Amino acid sequence: MAQQTVVVLNGPNLNLLGTREPQIYGRQTLDEIHGQIRARAGELGLEIVDCFQSNHEGALIDRLHEKDFDAAIVNAGGLTHTSVSLRDALLAVNRPFVEVHLTDPSTREPFRKVNFLADVAIASIVGHGVRGYTEALELLAERFKRRA
């Protein structure tokens, strides 16, 4: 069986991890997190085709449209609460994805209770901090194994 591939998408402001509200999001940078994701993926026999971050909705959608992956891990940041277009793109590419959030948005400001992605994701991992990304990889690896 060919190695299963995963793309990791991070939305607006996640490039500021490590400095943006560290009391909420922690002190690890996005590059450090991407390193942990790549290391764990290797241990699980998965290939990370890209760890992509953009502050622009259209760039995230364009990356999805490349369809060069078997599954995705998506931390859409604030777009979670506003982007019908990102939801539509995730549905259009017809690849399973796990939604990840470092915090639990539903326990924060009222506007964060709206979520356009959770009901179309195969799972949502929220409030587990950086560990949520590796948990998403483990979930995808198990899913791939069951379907092999």
Where does each model-flagged region fall?
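Short, hinge-like loop/turn segments at secondary-structure boundaries
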Residues: 67-68, 91-92, 114-119
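Glycine- and acidic-residue-enriched helix-capping/strand-helix junction motifs
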Residues: 17-31
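Short, glycine-/small-residue-rich phosphate/pyrophosphate-handling segment
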Residues: 98, 107-148
